[in-house]
Amino acid sequence: MNWLEAFILGIIQGLTEFLPISSTGHLYLGRHLFQLDEAGLFLDTMLHIGTLLAVFIYYKKEFIYLIKNPFSKLMLLLIVGTIPAVVIGLLFKDFFEDISKTGITIGWEFLVTGFFLYMADKQKNGRKKMDDITYKDAFIIGSFQAAAIFPAISRSGMTIVAALWRKLDRETAAYFSFLLSTPAIVGAIILQFADVFQGKAESISNTSLIVGTLSAAFFGYIAVSWMIQYLKRHSLKVFAYYVWGLGIIIITLQYTHVF
């Protein structure tokens, strides 16, 4: 893999991690385009580190607060919201890894993501701010996040949808969704490093790794800040239409054996 391919994959990871269109699904397509085995598993890990850096930079005040106040309500909300994904991930890790490798359901998963994004805008706007989020809210939002263990189910999309259904206001829904992404991204990095140390990763140059990581961090930061502002006044339907179109194209190509 050359540095330009790593740069492009970094853009894909950075933007799609925080736009509600599934980063894993798009990375799968990117890997297929560049004909990469296992994506370059180590590169995948570094791309996730890039998006983690983006979240840390954007939420630096919140993370400083969490470090100083490890037993705060915000910390407990993040823990409660992470529990469903941890449980599902540990119980069904091998099953979902097999699905991710084959990509056989990816088109249908994009369609499911689109359905939830479309239905979310049917809800009346809520008024809950960060201080109003309950542990029940966090658990339900986290349960939707657990569904994103399927490769083309958008994590940010599902958590934003769940947050809107729990009557968080639109800005807070995106804000909490991205904050909740931190434990999920850390978990993905840990699992990927485990596979790397087992020798499953292909060799990639240091230049490509650095370029991919910085690209993911830069475009991830842009996506976080843009999406929070976008959701204040705009609909999720445009993303629903996009993933529906993408899903239909993928299913068609799979059934005609082109993809």
UniProtKB/Swiss-Prot annotation:
Q: How does it sit in the membrane?
A: Multi-pass membrane protein
Q: Which reaction does it catalyse?
A: di-trans,octa-cis-undecaprenyl diphosphate + H2O = di-trans,octa-cis-undecaprenyl phosphate + phosphate + H(+)
Give the molecular function GO annotations.
undecaprenyl-diphosphatase activity
**Cellular-component GO terms for this entry:** plasma membrane
A Pfam cross-reference name: BacA
Work out whether the entry's keyword set contains Transmembrane: yes
Q: What's the EC number here?
A: 3.6.1.27
Localization recorded for this chain is:
Cell membrane
> What residue ranges are annotated as transmembrane?
1-21, 39-59, 71-91, 99-119, 133-153, 173-193, 208-228, 239-259
Q: Which GO terms describe its biological process?
A: cell wall organization; peptidoglycan biosynthetic process; regulation of cell shape; response to antibiotic
**Is the Transmembrane helix keyword given for this protein?**
yes
Give the InterPro entries listed for this entry: UppP
Keywords, A to Z, come to: Antibiotic resistance, Cell membrane, Cell shape, Cell wall biogenesis/degradation, Hydrolase, Membrane, Peptidoglycan synthesis, Transmembrane, Transmembrane helix
Other remarks?
Bacitracin is thought to be involved in the inhibition of peptidoglycan synthesis by sequestering undecaprenyl diphosphate, thereby reducing the pool of lipid carrier available.
Q: Which family does it belong to?
A: Belongs to the UppP family.
Per its database record, what is this protein's job?
Catalyzes the dephosphorylation of undecaprenyl diphosphate (UPP). Confers resistance to bacitracin.
Query: Which protein are we looking at?
Result: Undecaprenyl-diphosphatase 4
